[in-house]
Amino acid sequence: MKVYKDIFTNDEVCSDSYIQEDPFGNPEFREIAFEVKSNKRIKGNDDYGIADNSEDAVDGMGADVEHVIDIVDSFQLTSTSLSKKEYSAYVKNFMQRILKHLEEKKPDRVDIFKTKAQPLIKHILTNFDDFEFYMGESLDMEAGLIYSYYKGEEITPRFVYISDGLFEEKY
């Protein structure tokens, strides 16, 4: 299994157990980002058969049961809110950090990143109100944000990751 980690914090943010798709259905964005679909799951419904506390149950589930988004729960992502102005300042700084990283570690990616990042960020800014932003476990605002949005009538969000802000680790 491959786990994707943030290049600046080493936060685990995704794995190859999720099918990677073109971000926003746009193949041109695929060179610098990928999108995965999340699912909801039930957390805390542990029934060990010790006792039947049905008075605590609601619809057959215990009181400690909650529905969670699998990616958020598995990788301990935390939602954060940003104004459009704050996001613009963040993304400018983050893209400069990525570019510097690429110049040092992957110079063959520099031109691709310069060409493809701007349209992706423009798309995010144009549709800013449709996004929720997530941070990795370290809660470091210098790290990469994860972009979440709902596609069409889907009941769980999709998550978009900037590929050049991640590295793979095999387990």
Swiss-Prot record:
Record localization: Cytoplasm
Record-level GO cellular component terms: cytoplasm
Residue ranges constituting the TCTP domain according to the UniProt record: 1-171
Additional information: Seems to be one of the target of artemisinin.
GO terms assigned for molecular function: calcium ion binding
Keyword Cytoplasm attached: yes
Main location: cytoplasm
Keyword tags: Calcium, Cytoplasm
Protein name, per record: Translationally-controlled tumor protein homolog
Highest taxon above the source species: Eukaryota
InterPro entries, per the entry: Mss4-like_sf, Mss4/transl-control_tumour, TCTP, Translation_control_tumour_CS, Translational_control_tumour_p
Family note: Belongs to the TCTP family.
UniProt cross-references to Gene3D superfamilies, sorted A to Z: Metal Binding Protein, Guanine Nucleotide Exchange Factor, Chain A
Its job: Involved in calcium binding and microtubule stabilization.
